[in-house]
Regions:
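DNA polymerase processivity clamps
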Residues: 1-230
Length: 230
């Protein structure tokens, strides 16, 4: 299994920093390569890409032979962050900008064993496994049919969230209310009010062009039609 810095940094943002929530202070890795993290309020699931193959990773001491399936495990968030820092970022070879998870060695003990190298300085990074059962995150996944789909530029959403946090910087938490039209093809209105009564209203245009128009908006008619025909 190959993991790069972007994926590790991305999923780490969802882990808990609360010392009383032991099993949430880590990243759960499944045999499929999916990485899951949650703090109990927000859940992140990162699905691996398939652009690179493990067999092309430089041989630097990883276990030989057939690669067994990974036994799912939860890795301590501090170790995940240390692993991210160890991954080379300046190599011209894309595969070197990854850490290779040694399935055989990881399955055999209480730590995950990763190999990283810049082709001159190979090293092994061990990340402690958390002893316990990761929450059943599948139970909180939405199961009802999707009735609405709309896409926004992540940078625009970040600007709205940053502005809202600036307005409510002295508050324990800042809420943003989102309003959509019935079609979902027009702008979204985001509103936040701070404790001083100041209100910010932001209007965010949807991202267009990345998918066919018919894939966006209210999907209820299609669902009703499927229900009737079946």
């Amino acid at each position: 299994m190959l993991l790069n810095k972007k994926s590790l940094d991305c999923i780490s943002a969802f882990a808990s920093s609360d010392p009383t929530r032991y099993m949430l202070q880590g990243v759960h890795i499944e045999a499929s390569g999916n990485m899951i993290a949650t703090d109990g309020h927000i859940l992140g699931i990162l699905t691996p890409g398939d652009s690179l193959e493990e067999k092309d990773f430089p041989s630097i001491g990883q276990s030989a032979g057939d690669v067994p399936a990974l036994v799912p495990c939860t890795l301590a968030i501090d170790g995940i962050k240390a692993l991210s820092r160890a991954i080379p970022t300046k190599s011209r070879m894309p595969i070197v900008k990854h850490a290779l998870l040694d399935h055989t060695a990881t399955n055999a003990n209480g730590k995950a064993v990763f190999h990283v190298t810049d082709l001159e300085n190979p090293q092994v990074v061990n990340v402690a496994k958390l002893d316990g059962t990761f929450p059943n995150y599948v139970a909180v996944m939405p199961k009802d049919p999707t009735v609405y789909r709309i896409v926004f530029d992540a940078e625009l959403l970040k600007r709205v969230a940053t502005a809202a946090l600036t307005l409510g910087k002295d508050q324990k938490e800042t809420a943003i209310e989102l309003e959509f039209t019935a079609s979902g093809l027009s702008a979204m209105k985001a509103t936040t009010t701070n404790k001083d009564g100041q209100t910010l209203t932001a209007v965010v245009m949807p991202l267009r062009g990345s998918r066919p128009r018919e894939e966006y908006g209210l999907l209820v008619p299609a669902i009703i039609e499927d229900t009737v025909t079946t």
